[in-house]
């Protein structure tokens, strides 16, 4: 089963995707001059984190004041945030934008988020916390012993 972004909502969105420094900002400014009710929905997996302004190409405060932006600085770096959660908050943002007669413009470079919005999120089995906790304890133990190659050895066992 897949969590799906409503098709009627998708039809009202514009998508502008590409890597950092591809010209998305300039294209956005050009689009805003032609479609003044555009609001940007960040399609960037790093810009969602508060305090991660350096190295993420997060829009400047000036740009954010000129053009409404959504899904920036929404969680702390230590918090878990899944692609399914991204789709949900993006859907809500789009519904609010469209409700104001705005045009959602998804802009960013995280292909996983783009695919999830366009194609849905596969809902597989839940995480096995017993295994995750055991592996985390092993990694923590290796780190306490300065065993920098522990994880590499574990991967070699699994891959062979």
Task: Explain the meaning of each model-derived region.
Residues 1-160:
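Phosphate/pyrophosphate-binding catalytic cores of soluble transferases and nucleic-acid-acting enzymes
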């Amino acid at each position: 089963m897949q969590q799906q972004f409503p098709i009627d909502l998708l039809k009202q969105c514009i998508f502008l995707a590409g890597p950092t420094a591809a010209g998305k900002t300039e294209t956005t400014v050009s689009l805003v001059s032609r479609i003044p009710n555009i609001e940007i929905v960040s399609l960037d997996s790093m810009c969602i984190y508060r305090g991660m302004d350096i190295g993420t190409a997060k829009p400047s405060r000036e740009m954010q004041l000129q053009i409404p932006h959504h899904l920036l600085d929404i969680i702390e770096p230590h918090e878990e945030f899944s692609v399914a959660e991204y789709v949900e908050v993006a859907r809500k943002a789009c519904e609010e934008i469209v409700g104001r007669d705005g045009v959602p413009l998804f802009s960013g470079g995280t292909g996983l988020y783009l695919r999830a919005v366009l194609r849905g999120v596969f809902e597989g089995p839940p995480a096995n916390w017993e295994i995750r906790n055991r592996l985390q304890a092993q990694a923590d133990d290796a780190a306490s012993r300065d065993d920098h190659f522990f994880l590499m050895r574990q991967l070699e066992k699994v891959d062979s």
